[in-house]
Design a protein with these regions (language model features):
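Short aromatic-glycine-(Arg/Gly/Cys) micro-motifs in beta-strand/loop hairpins
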Residues: 2-20
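Acidic, glycine- and Ser/Thr-rich low-complexity intrinsically disordered tracts
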Residues: 3-4, 12, 214-215, 219, ...
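Acidic Gly/Asp/Thr-rich repetitive segments characteristic of extracellular carbohydrate-active
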Residues: 15-51
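Extracellular beta-strand-rich solenoid/capping regions of secreted or surface-exposed proteins
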Residues: 31, 36-39, 51-64, 72-112, ...
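All-beta strand scaffolds that present successive hydrophobic residues in beta-strands
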Residues: 45, 62-65, 89-93, 114-117, ...
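Short glycine/acidic-rich loop motifs that flank beta-strands on beta-rich extracellular proteins
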Residues: 50-56, 68, 74-80, 100-106, ...
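Histidine/lysine/aspartate-rich catalytic loop segments that bind and position anionic ligands
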Residues: 136, 146, 158-162, 169
């Protein structure tokens, strides 16, 4: 992935706050910049490894990293990224890594509607990315979700995200998973490979749009669904 040397233009028209632990004129950690950012401000994270915990609630977010191979945010005391009721915005170009011993995910998304692209979620003791809540409609595009102890991306509790062109691999359970009545993700053009169980799982009354996904080299099966689940197109046409 391309590494950004300079922040992109702020689409909201506000200021751009710089995070760089090696520059005394910049913010030392992303969470410090977030405390000072207005609703139209953008945060740009220069290359580096940052120990931090980012919690964003009830506000838009523009959080841009120099690239997922250049910027890592890790946390020992919980997941490094929590979004709650985030109405809009974008997060891109960052690796989120959980390094603790409790049951946490690398990305936790509750009832939010932002876009997450070009990121990496790794080493969660639960799934790498959990997406949940009846008002949860984020877009995840071109992310890597890997080396998590459960599934890569887990959608539940009536969430309806758009999940496209992500690569989910080397997770202990499934690449993509959906559960619960009212849950209805769009799984479009994702690649799930080398997961220890199957590529995609749907269970307990979940529904999903399932189009042009690739499931290969998983330990068990490519796509698994329990009988009460519904897919578009129907199972027999997948």
């Amino acid at each position: 992935m391309e590494i950004l040397n300079e922040p992109p233009p702020n689409p909201a028209g506000g200021e751009t706050l710089i995070v760089d632990a090696k520059d005394s004129s910049a913010y030392e950690r992303p969470s410090a910049a977030l405390k000072h950012a207005g609703p139209d401000d953008q945060i740009f994270i220069r290359p580096g490894i940052y120990e931090d915990k980012i919690f964003i609630a009830d506000r838009p977010i523009l959080l841009i990293g120099a690239g997922r191979d250049a910027v890592q945010i890790f946390c020992r005391r919980g997941g490094p990224l929590y979004l709650q009721n985030v109405p809009s915005g974008r997060i891109m170009g960052i690796t989120f890594r959980y390094v603790g011993s409790d049951q946490n995910s690398a990305m936790n998304i509750l009832d939010s509607t932002c876009t997450i692209s070009g990121c990496r979620a790794t080493e969660g003791l639960l799934s790498g990315v959990v997406i949940y809540g009846p008002n949860c409609r984020p877009t995840l595009i071109d992310n890597e979700v890997c080396h998590n102890r459960e599934s890569g991306i887990f959608v539940f509790a009536e969430a309806r995200p758009y999940i496209t062109q992500n690569r989910c691999f080397a997770n202990h359970h499934f690449g993509l998973a959906a559960r619960d009545p009212g849950t209805h993700p769009d799984f479009v053009r994702n690649t799930c490979h080398d997961n220890m169980l199957s590529g995609i799982l749907m269970f307990h009354h979940a529904e999903a749009l399932v189009l042009e996904n690739v499931c290969r080299d998983n330990r068990h099966w490519g796509f698994v669904t329990t009988p009460e689940c519904a897919t578009t197109p129907p199972r027999g046409e997948l």
